[in-house]
């Protein structure tokens, strides 16, 4: 088994084991520092090897906890991340962009402390706190209402009676962390590595009484939506304060960008003396009207920027430089380091990106280097401080996985293996194909992919659908029940929508959203096979580059063969049509709760295909709550709000 893949698999297994102990059984075996080291290592390896990504990885679950502990909440307004920088020059460039977009430079800005905590949204209806949710992926978070209500600095009732969502940061003060860790030690429990980890672990406890025992606090810093009669951010913060929320006192309001950079420098000296951890400042355009003019990108608002302090660094030795082969054939160098603690996390690997970067750094095995956690997440080598006398690292002439000659295209810095039969690439493609966001074949993880490729049972996507029980019985730890479950999962995946199949193919530039756009436009794979290059390129949001990539795949012998073989195997290649009229779900909002006979994803897809909208939380605007067995708080809330509650059978009758 490939060394990196095996390490990733082992790390995921260990982290899932410790997550279950910590979050579900409240019985951790390792310290938070040790856990953070495992988690940071896994996240780094996944970032360096995106082809090994798996939606089921613990790095894809907020705070590391198993997502089944909490129900999901769909944010009415996306909780976006902020663009961030460590450079005053970049802040000045941000200001210049705002000046250009607004047409003047006399707008006010607000700069305030960036608390190092956990983002949370609070929804109030009729002045009552109804839902508290984690940020999650920005679109969907987790319902942590019961735990959040134990935080004394969060009011359960406010005087504002219209519906409003207030956002802020949950944190633990430094002194409180010290006391909490003393209690943990006295009780024989593991201590927390830092305030942020303590806050994250505390709000995501299955037992709300544990959350109540933790010294959590909350600073309000923005709002998601709500009809408030204020013109700008500073006024809104004053309003929040009048409602009983705590807001950061470390704030300035000015129209002078130089005052912002001066505040940043002054505050860096002061932050060590603050009772809470701060990792930078946030700068926002004050006026809501001007914020609206500036707008947002897909991930962040243009009217705000996080001006962060430089990440922590450490000194260590490069033990070895290895080469990793990704799904697309790109060969990436990775430095294996003598483990070093940086900001409470053990770092034992660092990205070298590409061979030009190795040359720029002049790094060799045995060198002493400065490593930093860029963005406090992904470790990288900053520079060499002592020559270890090792040999110069040269780019491989042959693929470390298959031995084929490697190539470097003129317009790329990356070195690639272009052998389609390369085991590393085949495994990477298969892992992507079976992943949850693609064909979602439950149980077809890395260990299975590794073995079916090594045993030559599977060499392409279609081979997955030709696997036999007797073949699977030869795999490690596979007995009759496990074989049957995997074969059922493979069979179920044949019904996935065209959009998911397109994403599963791994066509360059085709992500989940692009797959949906293409599938909704063409509706059937035959239409795509018959389409011209112009047909692809003229689609809104596709454009020439993506259009060319998709067209090339559809016209390639390999693409046509793969599609034909998958069709023969019974894989669906059509996109469900949205019913525009003549049914009960058109324009209605549905919430699914409890255990259904069909997979939740299938039920949600059916609702969307018939014109419905799916939400993760219940409100007065919910049309139907579809309740299965063991329905919990969503059912209770629906009943209290008078929302129509229907069974799975009644739901299916609505879409007949």
Swiss-Prot record:
Enzyme superclass (EC): ligase
Function: DNA ligase that catalyzes the formation of phosphodiester linkages between 5'-phosphoryl and 3'-hydroxyl groups in double-stranded DNA using NAD as a coenzyme and as the energy source for the reaction. It is essential for DNA replication and repair of damaged DNA.
Magnesium as UniProt keyword: yes
Catalysed reaction, written as an equation: NAD(+) + (deoxyribonucleotide)n-3'-hydroxyl + 5'-phospho-(deoxyribonucleotide)m = (deoxyribonucleotide)n+m + AMP + beta-nicotinamide D-nucleotide
Listed GO biological process terms: DNA repair; DNA replication
Name of the protein in its database record: DNA ligase
Organism placement in taxonomy: Bacteria, Pseudomonadati, Elusimicrobiota, Elusimicrobia, Elusimicrobiales
Gene name of this polypeptide: ligA
Keyword vocabulary terms for this entry: DNA damage, DNA repair, DNA replication, Ligase, Magnesium, Manganese, Metal-binding, NAD, Zinc
GO MF entry, a single one: DNA ligase (NAD+) activity
Domain BRCT: residue ranges: 580-656
Organism: Elusimicrobium minutum (strain Pei191)
Keyword NAD: yes
Signal peptide: none
List of residues binding NAD(+): 32-36, 81-82, 112, 135, 169, 284, 308
Residues at the catalytic site: 114 (n6-amp-lysine intermediate)
EC number(s) from the headed UniProt entry: 6.5.1.2
Binding site for Zn(2+): 399, 402, 417, 422
One GO cellular component term: cytosol
InterPro entries hit by this protein: BRCT_dom (IPR001357), BRCT_dom_sf (IPR036420), DisA/LigA_HHH (IPR041663), DNA_ligase (IPR001679), DNA_ligase_AS (IPR018239), DNA_ligase_CS (IPR033136), DNAligase_adenylation (IPR013839), DNAligase_N (IPR013840)
Stated family: Belongs to the NAD-dependent DNA ligase family. LigA subfamily.
Co-factor(s): Mg(2+); Mn(2+)
């Amino acid at each position: 088994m490939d060394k990196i893949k095996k390490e990733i698999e082992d790390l995921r297994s260990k982290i899932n084991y410790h997550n279950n102990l910590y979050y579900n059984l409240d019985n951790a075996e390792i310290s938070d520092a040790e856990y953070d080291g495992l988690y940071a290592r896994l996240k780094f390896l996944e970032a360096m090897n995106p082809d090994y990504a798996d939606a089921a990885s613990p790095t894809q679950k907020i705070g590391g906890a198993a997502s089944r502990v909490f129900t999901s909440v769909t944010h009415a307004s996306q909780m976006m991340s902020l663009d961030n920088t460590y450079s005053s020059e970049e802040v000045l460039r941000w200001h210049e962009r705002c000046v250009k977009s607004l047409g003047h430079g006399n707008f006010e800005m607000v700069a305030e402390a960036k608390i190092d905590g956990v983002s949370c949204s609070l929804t109030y209806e009729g002045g009552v706190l109804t839902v508290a949710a984690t940020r999650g992926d920005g679109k969907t978070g987790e319902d942590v209402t019961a735990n959040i209500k134990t935080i004394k600095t969060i009011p359960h009732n406010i005087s504002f009676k219209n519906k409003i969502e207030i956002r802020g940061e949950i944190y633990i003060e430094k002194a409180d962390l010290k006391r909490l860790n003393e209690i943990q030690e006295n009780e024989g429990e593991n201590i927390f590595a830092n305030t942020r980890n303590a806050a994250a672990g505390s709000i995501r406890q299955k037992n709300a009484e544990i959350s109540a025992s933790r010294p959590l606090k909350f600073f309000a810093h923005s709002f998601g939506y709500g009809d408030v009669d204020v013109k700008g951010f500073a006024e809104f913060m004053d309003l929040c304060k009048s409602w009983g929320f705590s807001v950061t006192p470390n704030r300035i309001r000015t129209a002078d960008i130089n005052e912002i950079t001066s505040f940043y420098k002054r505050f860096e000296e002061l932050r060590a003396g603050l009772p809470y951890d701060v990792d930078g400042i946030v700068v926002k355009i004050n006026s809501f009207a001007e914020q609206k003019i500036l707008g947002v990108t897909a991930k962040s608002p243009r009217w705000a920027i996080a001006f962060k302090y430089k990440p922590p660094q450490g000194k260590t030795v490069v033990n070895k430089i290895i080469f990793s082969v990704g799904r697309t054939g790109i060969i990436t160098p990775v430095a294996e380091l003598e483990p070093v603690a940086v900001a409470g996390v053990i770092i034992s690997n660092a990205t070298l990106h590409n061979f030009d970067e190795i040359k720029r750094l002049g790094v060799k095995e045995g060198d002493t280097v400065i490593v930093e956690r860029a963005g406090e997440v992904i470790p990288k080598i900053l520079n060499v401080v002592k020559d270890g006398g090792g040999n110069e690292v040269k780019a491989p002439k042959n693929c470390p996985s298959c031995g084929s000659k490697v190539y470097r295209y003129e317009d790329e810095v990356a070195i690639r293996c272009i052998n389609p039969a390369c085991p590393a690439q085949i495994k990477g493609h298969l892992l992507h194909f079976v992943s949850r966001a693609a064909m979602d074949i439950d149980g077809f993880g890395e260990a299975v992919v590794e073995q079916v490729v090594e045993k030559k049972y599977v060499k392409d996507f279609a081979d997955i659908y030709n696997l036999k029980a007797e073949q699977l019985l030869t795999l490690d730890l596979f007995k009759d029940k496990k074989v049957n479950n995997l074969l059922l999962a493979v069979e179920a995946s044949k019904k996935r929508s065209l959009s998911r199949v397109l994403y599963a193919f791994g066509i360059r530039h085709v992500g989940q959203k692009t797959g949906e756009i293409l599938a909704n436009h063409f509706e059937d794979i035959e239409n795509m096979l018959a389409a011209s290059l112009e047909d692809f390129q003229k689609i809104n949001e596709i454009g020439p580059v993506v259009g060319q990539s998709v067209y090339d795949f559809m016209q390639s012998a390999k693409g046509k063969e793969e599609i034909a073989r998958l069709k023969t195997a019974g894989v669906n290649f059509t996109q469900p049509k949205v019913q525009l009229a003549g049914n009960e779900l058109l324009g209605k909002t549905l919430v699914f709760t409890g255990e259904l006979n069909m997979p939740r994803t299938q039920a949600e897809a059916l609702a969307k295909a018939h014109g419905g909208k799916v939400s993760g939380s219940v409100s007065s605007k919910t049309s139907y709550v579809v309740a299965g067995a063991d329905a919990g708080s969503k059912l209770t809330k629906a009943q209290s709000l008078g929302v129509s509650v229907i069974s799975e059978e009644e739901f299916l009758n609505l879409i007949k």
